[in-house]
Amino acid sequence: MMNYEIFKEVVKEKFMDYMPEKFKGMELVVEPVEKVNVTLDGIILREEGRNISPTIYINDMYKKYQNCGDLEETLMAACDFMERAYEQAPVVDV
């Protein structure tokens, strides 16, 4: 089983491979996100002309990976969640 840092690098490399074709032109960005007393590693997808994106936390993905032991299952579930969340996110003009 991979440690967290290796897992994070693999997720950065492979995440977009599991996203549907319509997301392929987007930029995957991993950024630290400050929460109460903790910093999490967030994934967002940037699309030109869109100012808002859902965030998925690699930390949560790693917990799922530790429980199931299956990287592909973990990535598929995260990408499915991202797709649904992205489609429900409002378009905000700034």
Predicted regions and their residues:
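Amphipathic alpha-helical interaction modules
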Residues: M19-I58
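Intrinsically disordered, low-complexity regulatory segments enriched in Ser/Thr/Pro
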Residues: I44-R84, V91
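Negatively charged, low-complexity tracts enriched in Asp/Glu with abundant Ser/Thr
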Residues: M1-E34, C68-M76
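Short acidic DE-rich linear segments
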Residues: M2, E87-V94
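Solvent-exposed amphipathic alpha-helical surface segments
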Residues: Y18, K22, M82-A85, A89
